[in-house]
């Protein structure tokens, strides 16, 4: 049985992420989606919200598990007995960072492979950062995220705007 881990912040989980999960889950016996509790990033959605979103969107895949992790990816990979780390590459600009991370992961986990996957054509330009920015500026993100995620984005943006108005 081959277990793979697909780590990320998923802030928010997009149609591009789901595309990779759908395709990777057809390759591996088990795909563990690792939602990172990263100290280096200031997420728009907190960890609990990101886990809820991931479970809402990905819950229908029988061989996909959604879990959070903190600390080094190598420890999460080991705990889950994974043999593969799945990473998405949207553009050449992603490659340099991902290549360096794959090299470090190979050093730390010599028996674990990193597999790069490119998103389907219609999702190559989508990123969580761009989706958040569009949502915060009042734009339509319905083509980039699932309806439940769009609703959460709208609610979060409205709450932030109310908080700003209350504390000018």
Swiss-Prot record:
Principal location class: cytoplasm
Subcellular location: Cytoplasm
One BP term from GO: coenzyme A biosynthetic process
Enzyme class name: transferase
Required cofactor(s): Mg(2+)
Pathway(s) served: Cofactor biosynthesis; coenzyme A biosynthesis; CoA from (R)-pantothenate: step 4/5
Alphabetized PANTHER family for the sequence: PHOSPHOPANTETHEINE ADENYLYLTRANSFERASE
Function comment: Reversibly transfers an adenylyl group from ATP to 4'-phosphopantetheine, yielding dephospho-CoA (dPCoA) and pyrophosphate.
Protein name (record): Phosphopantetheine adenylyltransferase
